[in-house]
């Protein structure tokens, strides 16, 4: 059985111990259920930059890649690029992750550029965001500019590309290791190429580099008859644990994982299957534990606009997508904050996401957060929490599917590995 307790320091109080295994079992299927009940299964230990365990933290801090959570002081970050953003072909996995009012858009423009004027404005917004990050003392890295309109073909499928806008989707930093995710969309099969020059440089300078097993993305990975006509259909299917991705082979987006020191929280979604989560669990054990949490969400794809851990014992929980295990966090002494309703207008295009990008924020440290300049309600929420807001307008960038957390991958945060749950 999986035991969880929160180690809380300072004014946050004493330890609290809670058992969660029985509450998670219903989320598991088949052998995945049995495997997750044991924390002693086969594991691959994380290797520090220096072999001597006594200097582990020091060695990790000397690596160019080092990040254990979502809130330690940010020193270096990758920011995505909107350049050449291409509409993905309207395949079954894209349909399962988008809202029906945009389906005609995908049917008409799949394989073509997103609206050029919109992308141009998004580029300007992200450039301004980079300037602000640099002003705040953060080193900013960017992926390569690539032509995503080129058609490619594998033995199993053919597609055009999409973009390198959301590094959070493809890269996950755990300690001194950078992990390339085996994403589930065919249009994102070669997205890693935009980041390889950066990753190779980090590797040469001492970081650990892992590429998860690349999926074939054969037809068997997808339920070709996934019965979606409306969001209500998806809600019912997700509630029954039915998703467009099957368990044919491991797949996951890095953005379906949320880090809190030694504990990492993941969700089964339309792009992340149990095999993918199991691969991560084995790969990161025994130094890290991966826990599955679930939500009342008709369109689960990425955890960070649903459940965003912004500090030790502090989490934003989407009121429209309540976490089924939220009482575990409350009983452990965590502060659960419900963010206000987003202010983004109904007529603003959001081709790949919901309005809840308002809570998809980037923590620069425990007391500074980068947040959308237009979301005045959430500014007030952070002020009440004693967190200063750094306001940047990225509304046009939002349309491409992400907020500040999505548009970034924190490469280096100044901190050490700690336990917040055990």
From Swiss-Prot:
Protein name: Glycine amidinotransferase, mitochondrial
Enzyme class: transferase
Gene: gatm
Subunit field text: Homodimer.
Residue intervals passing through the bilayer: none
Transit peptide (residue range): 1-37
GO molecular function: glycine amidinotransferase activity
Family statement drawn from the similarity comment of this UniProt entry: Belongs to the amidinotransferase family.
Annotated GO CC locations: mitochondrial inner membrane; mitochondrial intermembrane space
Record keyword Cell division present: no
């Amino acid at each position: 059985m999986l035991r969880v307790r929160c180690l809380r320091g300072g004014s946050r109080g004493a330890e609290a111990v809670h058992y969660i295994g029985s509450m998670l079992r219903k989320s598991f299927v088949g052998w995945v259920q049995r495997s997750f009940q044991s924390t002693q299964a086969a594991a691959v230990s994380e290797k520090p930059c220096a072999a001597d365990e006594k200097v582990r933290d020091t060695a990790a801090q000397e690596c160019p890649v080092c990040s254990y959570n979502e809130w330690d002081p940010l020193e270096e970050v990758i920011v995505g690029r909107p350049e050449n953003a291409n509409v993905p072909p309207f395949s079954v996995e894209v349909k399962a992750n988008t809202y029906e009012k945009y389906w005609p858009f995908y049917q008409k423009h799949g394989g073509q550029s997103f609206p050029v004027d919109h992308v141009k404005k998004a580029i300007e917004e992200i450039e301004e965001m980079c300037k602000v990050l640099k002003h705040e003392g953060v080193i900013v890295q960017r992926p390569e500019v690539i032509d995503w309109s080129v058609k490619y073909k594998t033995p199993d499928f053919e597609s055009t590309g999409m973009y390198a806008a959301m590094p959070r989707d493809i890269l996950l930093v755990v300690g001194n290791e950078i992990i390339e995710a085996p994403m589930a969309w065919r249009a994102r099969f070669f997205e890693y190429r935009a980041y390889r020059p950066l990753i190779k440089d980090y590797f040469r300078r001492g970081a650990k580099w892992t590429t998860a097993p690349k999926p074939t993305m054969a037809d068997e990975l997808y339920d070709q008859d996934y019965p979606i006509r409306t969001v209500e259909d998806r809600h019912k299917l997700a509630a029954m644990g039915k998703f467009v991705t099957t368990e044919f082979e491991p797949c996951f987006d890095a953005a379906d994982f949320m880090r809190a020191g030694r504990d990492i929280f993941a969700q089964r979604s339309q792009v992340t299957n149990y095999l993918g989560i199991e691969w991560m669990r084995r790969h990161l054990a025994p130094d890290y534990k991966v826990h599955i949490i679930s939500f009342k969400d008709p369109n689960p794809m990425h955890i960070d606009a649903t459940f965003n851990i912004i500090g030790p014992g502090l989490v934003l929980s989407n009121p429209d997508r309540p976490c089924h295990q939220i009482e575990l966090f409350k009983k452990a002494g965590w502060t659960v904050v419900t963010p206000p309703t987003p202010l983004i207008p109904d007529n603003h295009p959001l081709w790949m996401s919901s309005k809840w990008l308002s809570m998809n924020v980037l923590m620069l440290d425990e007391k500074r957060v980068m947040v959308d300049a237009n979301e005045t309600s959430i500014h007030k929420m952070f002020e009440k929490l004693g967190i200063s807001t750094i306001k940047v307008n990225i509304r046009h960038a939002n349309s491409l599917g992400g907020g500040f957390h999505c548009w970034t991958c924190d490469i280096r945060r100044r901190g050490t590995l700690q336990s917040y749950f055990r």
